Amino acid sequence: MLASIILSGWLLLAWLYFLWSRRRYYKVAWQLRGPIGWPLIGMGLQMMNPETFLQYMDGLSRQFKAPFISWMGTSCFLYINDPHSVEQILNSTHCTNKGDFYRFMSSAIGDGLFTSSSPRWHKHRRLINPAFGRQILSNFLPIFNAEAEVLLQKLELEGVQHGKRLEIYQILKKIVLEAACQTTMGKKMNFQHDGSLCIFKAYNGLTEVCVKRMLSPWLYPDLIYRRSGLFRLQQKVVGILFGFIEQLLEPIVSVVAANSNPDQQRSEMEMRGKSKAIFIEQVREHVERGQLSWQDVRDEANVTIAATFETTSTALYFTILCLAMHPCYQEKLHKELVTELPPSGDINLEQLQRLEYTEMVINEAMRLFAPVPMVLRSADQDIQLKRGDGEFLIPRGTQIGIDIYNMQRDERVWGPLSRTYNPDAHFGLDSPQRHAFAFVPFTKGLRMCIGYRYAQMLMKLLLARIFRSYRISTEARLEELLVKGNISLKLKDYPLCRVERR
């Protein structure tokens, strides 16, 4: 009996200490009131379904004036979806670290630029940044044009000659991943011609595993997670993806391992030159200089390939789908393409830069269907958040969710046509001036996506090559599409499209 009383007393004291240590979070939660969660799991039960997560957060933002505080597990979660607050967070030197929830991704795919924290992120960004410079990207155009030709042949054979309605997203993913492997790793994989479905299923499975864990607070402790079926699925898909990355890296690893002469290494580095410094060449040099380890290279390669192909193929697909659902804008795009481009053949950089309306239709699709619907940051120091009715202290350790998807659809920011596809109204010359952070498909500020120029160039070129020669249509309607929350935006069902030669 006495032992039970003593144990109960200790548990009560521990609970009171836990509450006292978090008093600053409770204070800001009182000021920025949001939904009240359950003890220990917070809003986990309400948010656990990825298929309704974005719609649920949109409903909360209408019920509570954002920014507001919610809870995921025991983590204090600041939700923002207005450009003014987003600007403050993305430009803050105290919010450059990704949210704590990204540790679930780094434990699965490695600690690369997308998931890492300072000072590791600063060091790796500085070392890898030259691989995504403008001059390097212009050297990728022959690869992009070659992959565009493969894409057109696929559309011609299956869509036109065989008359099949196509699930274009699956075709695009193979094209974009092929381009990513060639331009970052220097290796051609022929995804369109071999049985590579397991790679794409593994990438899709990995993102679903990470999101399910993020939305399930009871799986946050590693002790519990490692005994779950979700962890076993993670191990399976990670094994496939790590094998794929090792296949890409193996030739480079072998060359470096065999070349132990420092003078010979320096000579080879000078011969390669900066003009050919693609990602793998950059990191190879850093390994030879002792600035990166091969584990760093594996992590960065895994994350770079995954992020490049996932976000780019998603944005490109939604652009094509929006144009298929809105033939009037597709015809305006075609008019620009026949005016600015030759009737066939490759597209060069100068021609690509003249395609202003092409860029508009891409931006409008990324506004309506943000490739990465939500990004997370973590406050590593106390910060002051300004709102219309005053300033609020956001305590160190607060997790910050930036809801890009719903912000870019908000009628208070984008007007009455915010949930319609209308490139002219939102990005045309006569469109209203908007906050600089109202449109952030690649984020902005101190941790802007390193590959945004790469994605823009590849999307513009593929889109131009497709719609110069083909017309795409679908029976789907914009209001019928059901999106799912994921690392990159997904649809519950992918509509089929019909392809016709012009």
UniProtKB/Swiss-Prot annotation:
Positions annotated to bind heme: C449
UniProt entry tagged with the keyword RNA-binding: no
GO molecular function, one term: monooxygenase activity
Membrane topology annotation: Peripheral membrane protein
Keywords: Endoplasmic reticulum, Heme, Iron, Membrane, Metal-binding, Microsome, Monooxygenase, Oxidoreductase
One GO cellular component, as annotated: endoplasmic reticulum membrane
Cofactors required: heme
Subcellular location: Endoplasmic reticulum membrane; Microsome membrane
Alphabetized Gene3D superfamilies for the sequence: Cytochrome P450 (1.10.630.10)
UniProt keyword annotation of Zinc present: no
Family membership: Belongs to the cytochrome P450 family.
Task performed by this protein: May be involved in the metabolism of insect hormones and in the breakdown of synthetic insecticides.
Protein name: Probable cytochrome P450 313b1
Gene assigned in the entry: Cyp313b1
